[in-house]
Amino acid sequence: MASILHYFLALSLSCSFLFFLSDSVTPTKPINLVVLPVQNDGSTGLHWANLQKRTPLMQVPVLVDLNGNHLWVNCEQQYSSKTYQAPFCHSTQCSRANTHQCLSCPAASRPGCHKNTCGLMSTNPITQQTGLGELGEDVLAIHATQGSTQQLGPLVTVPQFLFSCAPSFLVQKGLPRNTQGVAGLGHAPISLPNQLASHFGLQRQFTTCLSRYPTSKGAIIFGDAPNNMRQFQNQDIFHDLAFTPLTITLQGEYNVRVNSIRINQHSVFPLNKISSTIVGSTSGGTMISTSTPHMVLQQSVYQAFTQVFAQQLPKQAQVKSVAPFGLCFNSNKINAYPSVDLVMDKPNGPVWRISGEDLMVQAQPGVTCLGVMNGGMQPRAEITLGARQLEENLVVFDLARSRVGFSTSSLHSHGVKCADLFNFANA
């Protein structure tokens, strides 16, 4: 009798697996790149994506967090999948996720609630709330592409993608509406880039091209995009990449170093002259983040920055500031805003240019504000480059060689938007 039950159980699992395979295909060529379409949330300025997960596959909307350690989703409501598993405590999967905490849930078994599993701490990057959840594994599917075409390829799968089933309170504040979790792109072992690179044999590298416009999509491209997507509409959109060293903080955050700031070629000051009050910070430490929409500056940097910026524009154009911004203008009295140059790494290092358009925010009809925030005396970094500074720009995170590449000219100068890179119609 036991052998008969075992036979029917095996047959059932095989049928489930075959049903799952019908939603995806096995590629006939080596996979060079995989692509995650990403959207701009108009109400928050943050970016989110629909991940294809579970069996049968369904779309799960998640916030994109550049510095997140792993993927976490809310499993407490309507998580249904034929392929979900919870690895046992002290298993290989738990070691890979760098967690040695055992967790047992006394309620009936369901995704996120099992006995003798691994506990994994997840963080809402907007509210900084944390919550302990169950380490789980389930199917994840993502679009493959060869890079030589704008068409998104078929869905390819990671059958046992590791993630956290986080408590539901983590999604209740701060995230874009209807999102059910966070996709971490950080440096941790089970982050999205590291698991995809390991499973598909990709280079440990990903490129962001975030759309500025809520009505169109951008993309995160995993793999060596600069060498596989060079020819786009008969032009090399990666030809002007400049690179700067990438460091990882103790918290696992992506950091680069800014040596100095210039506004319309007027020097703000070299950052190594700042007496930093940030614990554990090195002078010029700059975090790159998608969990804040705007640039954030340590207070002394902010004060000098806004002073020099205001000096480049007619004083009579200034108007009363609109919270949360500190410097605002009558947009009808200004034709163009000054550009900002971040001199990277060393005095003669490459220049990351941010156009005036990329810094300004329309706060009210006829009122435009400098989208730079005062981070106080002890922010997480002296400078934080927010999502808006990454938009409509190719930014390459080369984890294998510990460097970040950025375009020294905007995509707009090529007549291209992030939405043009792929045909997102069916994504």
From Swiss-Prot:
It comes from the Eukaryota. SUPFAM superfamilies: Acid proteases. Keywords: Disulfide bond, Seed storage protein, Signal, Storage protein. It holds the Pfam family TAXi_C. Residues 1-24 form the signal peptide. GO terms for molecular function: aspartic-type endopeptidase activity; identical protein binding; nutrient reservoir activity. Residues 47-407 form the Peptidase A1 domain. Belongs to the peptidase A1 family. PANTHER family: ASPARTYL PROTEASE-RELATED, BASIC 7S GLOBULIN. This is Basic 7S globulin. It comes from Glycine max (Soybean). The lineage of its organism: Eukaryota, Viridiplantae, Streptophyta, Embryophyta, Tracheophyta. The gene is BG.
